[in-house]
């Protein structure tokens, strides 16, 4: 159903949202703009506003009861791509699987990929996300060249190492508190291979897991673990997965990343 948002004369849909960890639900007002002018209007009109990415934060990071959340799912376009200089500018609502499906066609990518393909690019910037090779590649900050944000008091701001650097640093990992992330320019890196050799090793504890992962952080290998947290006597036991790029296997064909659906099972007690 629809309700009139108390601070404007516009119609805003009211929906119930639940956090990814299933611990919090709330009725919120939501709008999905498709024009830059709408971003300005909604930001100025609402007293309490939160920018929403894909909504996959474990906590309720992008919504609160009776507040207005602006979803950026329609801002999902490639604005500029420079293959020669390995640079791309995308809107913040673009999903990771869309970004990779585009860049991998040109044998380019960003390795700091969160664990789910539907996470938004702006959401990854707002949390300074990392991938499965973070010991080697670091966080997504290492490949960000520029950011455009909109702030209700300061207006449109361009951020980089050379322009508004302090706000640039605060925006990456700032959970949107410096303003709404509109678009991001990345430095891309070469993608070395399209096949991987995967190994699985048993881990006996959380400490054992940390040690084994640290031993593999000085390479481009993807290393991650699944650890049980529901057993007091065997806390942290699980498995370590390692994916090594197979440079001997060459393929000119890029397999598209599918839009998958995550099925949440509340009975699982794994940390990834």
Task: Label every model-predicted segment.
Residues 59-77, 133-154, 180-187:
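Structural signature of FAD isoalloxazine-binding scaffolds in flavoprotein oxidoreductases
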Residues 21-115, 128-133:
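Glycine-rich N-terminal segment of FAD-binding domains in flavoprotein oxidoreductases
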Residues 8-30, 260-272:
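Intrinsically disordered, low-complexity segments enriched in small residues
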Residues 43, 61-62, 80-83, 119, ...:
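Solvent-exposed alpha-helices and their adjacent loops that cap or buttress functional pockets
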Residues 126, 145-272:
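C-terminal substrate-binding/cap subdomain adjacent to the FAD-binding core in PCMH-type
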């Amino acid at each position: 159903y629809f309700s009139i948002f108390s601070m404007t004369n516009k119609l805003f849909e009211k929906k119930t949202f639940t956090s990814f960890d299933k611990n919090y639900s709330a009725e919120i007002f939501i709008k999905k703009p498709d024009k830059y002018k709408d971003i300005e209007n909604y930001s100025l009109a609402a007293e309490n506003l939160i920018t929403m990415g894909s909504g996959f934060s474990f906590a309720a990071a992008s919504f609160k009861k009776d507040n207005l959340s602006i979803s950026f799912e329609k801002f999902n376009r490639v604005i500029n791509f420079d293959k020669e200089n390995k640079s791309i500018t995308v809107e913040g609502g673009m999903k990771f699987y869309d970004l990779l499906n585009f860049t991998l066609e040109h044998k380019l990518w960003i390795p700091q990929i969160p664990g789910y393909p539907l996470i938004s690019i702006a959401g990854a910037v707002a949390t300074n996300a990392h991938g499965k090779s973070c010991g080697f590649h670091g966080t997504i900050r290492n490949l960000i060249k520029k950011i455009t944000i909109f702030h209700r008091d300061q207006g449109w701001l361009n951020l980089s190492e050379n322009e508004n650097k302090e706000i640039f640093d605060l925006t990456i990992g700032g959970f949107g508190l410096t303003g709404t992330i509109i678009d991001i320019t990345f430095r891309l890196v070469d993608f070395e291979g399209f096949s991987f050799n995967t190994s699985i090793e048993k881990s006996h504890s959380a400490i054992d897991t940390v040690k084994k992962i640290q031993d593999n952080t000085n390479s481009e290998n993807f290393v991650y673990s699944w650890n049980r947290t529901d057993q007091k006597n065997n806390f942290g036991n699980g498995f370590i997965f390692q994916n090594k790029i197979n440079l001997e296997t060459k393929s000119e064909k890029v397999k598209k990343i599918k839009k998958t659906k995550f099925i949440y099972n509340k009975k699982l007690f794994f940390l990834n």
